[in-house]
Amino acid sequence: MLGLSQEAVDFQQRGFRGASVFMRNRLENVGGAFLAGYHLALECDSPEDLGSKLTEVELERRGVAFEGAAMGLALLDFLTPWRRDRISQFLRGAGDSHTYMIHVGVGWVWARIPFGFRRWQKKLDPLLGWLAFDGWGFHEGFFHWPKYIAGQPPPKKLKGYERRSFDQGFGRSLWFVNGGNIELIAQTISNCSADRQSDLWSGIGLAATYAGIVSETSLGELREKAGEFQPQLAQGAAFAAKARQRAGNLTDYTSLATKILCGLPAVDAARLTDAALENLRADSNVPAYEIWRRRIQNHFTPARQLQKT
């Protein structure tokens, strides 16, 4: 009853466009890893057993399997009010090194059961909890892309910065919807309202770096297409490098992507995100998560354009 079929990530079924045969196979395999993790979470009896099974997934796609597992665990937490500790247990154990992906995976459940999510957020990491809204945005962009690229805003339930986090995830989904086709991606974002484009480019930077895989030439084209949003693109790429570095699944492609999009090797891009956490505090209007993002973006921004942090 709770299963998700392979058709859920089939590009033809989803109506996605722009992908070469290679990219379609590549991105469908990424989706397949998510489904594998999701179903493992429903089948395994303990977080330890789940963690052990997830380590059998190919290293490059293992983080996505952890993301899918997080959706499964979060769904079980929701369905069993007498036991709502699966996500927290997983984060304390086998899921610790994949904490970024797990927070994103929780958001898939929020997208499907969109109530009580603010109570859920309070149980997540105070900084990374915003990634669940990112996961919500990815889910909506992936499964309902026609209405969102036609201009539908984030759900009315979302307020304030929740809407921006949603758009960061929606931006990630555009990498899949457009099959990694740089021209289509740029065109899709340019058709969105101007106040959303910076967050969409941030999401693209993350997806292009984490999920890939395109050529060095295509990455250079992506950077040029981002134009004034190159700092946001680079910040997303740095986030991807950090997620992979913490999980121990950096690849040669990760470094290629960060070299082009950030001007840094992957390990240095990941280190930059750590440095940006120093003395990080929220203010009355801006979440600490957004201040963190801005600090990273400022590293890639000419001095005259620096944002206050």
Model regions: which residues?
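Mature, well-folded catalytic/scaffold domains that follow N-terminal targeting or propeptide regions
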Residues: 1-309
